[in-house]
């Protein structure tokens, strides 16, 4: 495989390996095999010990020092396992995300009331989601920002028993509405709930045939005058995992919308669309759209994807290329070298003179 097949990873990993026991377990667990299984068990035990002793800060520091996306994913998998209900007394928390693509001519708001009865009734119809219909649902929806402010230590305390769960639920912020900016926007909202250990088996599974009915529940519950809305339901999962999945899907759908709009506007004035893909220092991917010929160039249209610690660049890149293929765009330039943190992305006519290749016709091996 060519080193230039995928966009380079510019996330700021530590320059030197950090010799922390937690990180060493994570790296070994990521490698798999018999030793990897032992390391994964040790990793879970250590995270459990940290959270039991209220040492969340140590875990947070270790997560910030992970040397790779793979190691970070291994640590998060261990954390999500620790946050699961393990006994009949413990509580299983879950989040049910929905991605909202909205359009409005002026700033607006959606209701933040969770459609709990409708969600429960819908999920009760399918064996793989039925247990969620017996859960306790919180009466309101939460934003991604609000979910991200809850740390693993708080989730760990809230799972100890029913009393702790109810106390935690009562302490969460109250929302009257979910604000929308003027124009098009893509955001995530979350329904939260909790129940017994039986819920664990429902988490992280594909919605399958429940997806369309669930979408209809969200559409009806969140519709508002003057707002064009499309709701994309995601699978229920533990709150940290749901936050990660929703963050990725929100950006993916935002990029889809931006791409379609950009291609449409360029084709109104130029016969050929040129697309530039690049990494940017500081952990970002940048996608630019313009005419292929400099004499037809328009105002640059650029989308920036800030990479989360668990984003897989190869997946982001392939999803984008699949979308371009659907839009019948063939003039693509993937730049081999990252652009500077404060540099503008070159236009297509500039990019073809820089080291790079068209990923539709090779992996950059001979470019």
PLM feature spans:
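Charged, amphipathic alpha-helical stretches
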Residues: 1-75
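Extended, non-transmembrane interaction/recognition domains
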Residues: 105-348
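Long amphipathic alpha-helical coiled-coil/heptad-repeat bundle
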Residues: 47, 52-58, 62-152
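Short cysteine-rich clusters marking metal-coordination/redox-active sites
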Residues: 349-357
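Cysteine-rich micro-motifs
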Residues: 363-367
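Short functional micro-motifs and their immediate structural scaffolds
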Residues: 358-362
């Amino acid at each position: 495989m060519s080193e230039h097949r995928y966009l380079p990873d510019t996330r700021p990993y530590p320059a030197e390996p950090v010799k922390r026991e937690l990180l060493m377990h994570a790296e070994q667990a990521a490698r798999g095999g018999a030793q990897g299984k032992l390391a994964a068990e040790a990793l879970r035990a250590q995270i459990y010990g940290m959270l039991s002793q209220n040492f969340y800060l140590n875990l947070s520091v270790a997560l910030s020092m992970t040397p790779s996306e793979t190691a970070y994913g291994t640590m998060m998998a261990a954390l999500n396992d620790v946050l699961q209900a393990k006994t009949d007394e413990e509580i299983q928390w879950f989040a049910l995300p929905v991605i909202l693509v909205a359009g409005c001519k002026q700033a607006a708001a959606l209701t933040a009331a969770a459609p709990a009865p409708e969600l429960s009734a819908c999920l009760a119809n399918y064996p793989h989601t039925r247990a969620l219909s017996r859960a306790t649902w919180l009466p309101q929806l939460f934003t991604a920002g609000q979910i991200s402010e809850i740390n693993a230590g708080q989730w760990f305390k809230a799972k100890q028993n029913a009393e702790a769960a109810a106390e935690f639920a009562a302490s969460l912020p109250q929302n009257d509405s979910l604000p929308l900016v003027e124009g098009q926007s893509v955001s995530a909202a979350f329904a939260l709930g909790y129940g017994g250990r039986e819920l664990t088996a429902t988490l992280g599974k594909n919605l399958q045939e429940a997806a369309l009915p669930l979408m209809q529940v969200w559409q009806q519950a969140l519709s508002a005058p003057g707002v064009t809305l499309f709701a994309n339901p995601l699978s229920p999962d533990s709150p940290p995992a749901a936050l990660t999945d929703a963050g990725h899907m929100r950006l993916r759908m935002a990029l889809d919308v931006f791409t379609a709009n950009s291609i449409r506007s360029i084709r109104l004035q130029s016969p050929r669309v040129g697309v530039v893909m690049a990494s940017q220092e500081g952990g970002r991917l940048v996608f630019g759209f313009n005419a292929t010929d400099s004499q037809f160039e328009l105002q640059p249209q650029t989308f920036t994807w800030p990479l989360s610690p668990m984003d897989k660049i190869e997946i982001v890149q392939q999803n984008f290329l699949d979308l371009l293929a659907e839009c019948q765009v063939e003039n693509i330039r993937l730049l081999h070298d990252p652009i500077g943190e404060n540099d503008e992305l070159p236009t297509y006519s500039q990019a073809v003179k820089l080291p790079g290749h068209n990923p539709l016709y090779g992996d950059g091996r001979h470019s």
